[in-house]
Amino acid sequence: MAISWAAATTSKLAYPPHVHFSPSPSSNYLFLKTHKPSATHLSSSFIHPTTILHLAAANTTTRRRSFTVRAARGKFERKKPHVNIGTIGHVDHGKTTLTAALTMALASLGNSAPKKYDEIDAAPEERARGITINTATVEYETENRHYAHVDCPGHADYVKNMITGAAQMDGAILVVSGADGPMPQTKEHILLAKQVGVPNIVVFLNKQDQVDDEELLQLVELEVRELLSKYEFPGDDVPIISGSALLSLEALMANPSIKRGENQWVDKIYELMEAVDDYIPIPQRQTELPFLLAIEDVFTITGRGTVATGRVERGTIRVGETVDIVGVKDTRNTTVTGVEMFQKILDEALAGDNVGLLLRGIQKTDIQRGMVLAKPGTITPHTKFSAIVYVLKKEEGGRHSPFFSGYRPQFYMRTTDVTGKVTEIMNDKDEESKMVMPGDRVKLVVELIVPVACEQGMRFAIREGGKTVGAGVIQSIIE
């Protein structure tokens, strides 16, 4: 079942203890991080950098970061269709190295700004451990498309942050080491991609240079195809390109103007992006529906006001239009005074764009992750709803035991997770039931502890103890 949700780990604002919020990929477009851990400082223009932001992880202490904000460099020209993709896969299989190689290879064609590995893996804690904790975002272009690329963490502690990145992808590049084959997080990321509704996957078999036997690489390819088919992706049809992200990156760093045909490993990167261009379709954006953006992060810019960042889920937004801020607190109204993406000013943000919106008269304390910005009157906050829920089996990574009425897990809805209580359980025939077994499909009535902007047909995930235990869709709003 495809679900859209984002994860939560730690909070930067003084949130109530029952609502948890986590770092966002789209905010990464907005603010350039510096490495001194000090009080937050923002300069006075409203803008967009392209590197990683802050660190927040399930098992780590969040440090204060200082942020600087860069002036917008001109206007964003919408010449090519925009697609959100990202790298997923097991820790140390080469996701961040591949992301760096992609930006450098396309920069050599004049289609992107090159990003070095340590610009993508920028948080000090990440570089110390050599792993990506936050979801980092870069932009690049092929001949046909403009891409926003999210580099997702692979380390088990940080799967929640990976969810945040995956929830906004139109397609993913699954990175698997040809030397090791699929590993535990490879499987978990494929499952999560399915759950959050990532529609298409292209595979990059990395570290080909470390595999002496061609047959071994073919076995790994077969194993990956079987794994994708197991999680209901078309395993037999998925494009699989093998190569070496590290050797291509080294070649590009030695000669940034390298041309196609001059290095076999760099050519593999171009081959991968051709597969992505061909295989991952341009998504149909819901531009005709009323505007809605789920807030992923909030910043204050001295002298200008408060910026909310996130991905436009549907509709369009222009400077001067009014929006409702809905969820968690009382609904209030504000005017959008600026719209930007990738350090460039936009006339209009469309569904699918990751943007920053400057809001008039709003303090940072008035607004937080998990709220939504929406066209006035189109969505309201609720605390009680009925939903059809599929409870994952033990083999799917779910619970090992049943749960009963009164069960209190976390409900992941768009960019928030909030504690909710299961107050009623009904079976397929609408008869009251006492318990729910892993693998059951049931109707539940859920009561949330804070109001959240939700609507009929909205998908959510249920998580408990660091794992996904169920997936559902709201059938009706009760209150």
Curated annotation (Swiss-Prot):
Domain tr-type G: start-end pairs: 80-284
Gene3D superfamilies linked to this entry: P-loop containing nucleotide triphosphate hydrolases, Translation factors
Statement: the UniProt record of this protein carries the keyword GTP-binding: yes
Main location: plastid
G2: annotated segments: 130-134
Gene: TUFB1
Entry's localization field: Plastid, Chloroplast
Native source organism of the sequence: Glycine max (Soybean)
Recorded GO MF terms: GTP binding; GTPase activity; translation elongation factor activity
A Pfam family the protein falls into: GTP_EFTU
Region: G3, residue numbers: 151-154
UniProt keyword Protein biosynthesis present: yes
Targeting signal (transit peptide) range: 1-70
Residue segments, region G4: 206-209
Coiled coil start-end: none
Residue sites binding GTP per the record: 89-96, 151-155, 206-209
InterPro entries: EF-Tu_GTP-bd (IPR041709), EF-Tu_GTPase (IPR050055), EFTu-like_2 (IPR004161), EFTU_2 (IPR033720), G_TR_CS (IPR031157), P-loop_NTPase (IPR027417), Small_GTP-bd (IPR005225), T_Tr_GTP-bd_dom (IPR000795)
Region (G1): 89-96
Family: Belongs to the TRAFAC class translation factor GTPase superfamily. Classic translation factor GTPase family. EF-Tu/EF-1A subfamily.
Keyword line: Chloroplast, Elongation factor, GTP-binding, Nucleotide-binding, Plastid, Protein biosynthesis, Transit peptide
Protein role: This protein promotes the GTP-dependent binding of aminoacyl-tRNA to the A-site of ribosomes during protein biosynthesis.
Annotated segments matching region G5: 244-246
The protein's name: Elongation factor Tu, chloroplastic
Residues that span the membrane, as ranges: none
GO BP, one annotated term: mitochondrial translational elongation
GO CC annotations, alphabetized: chloroplast; mitochondrion
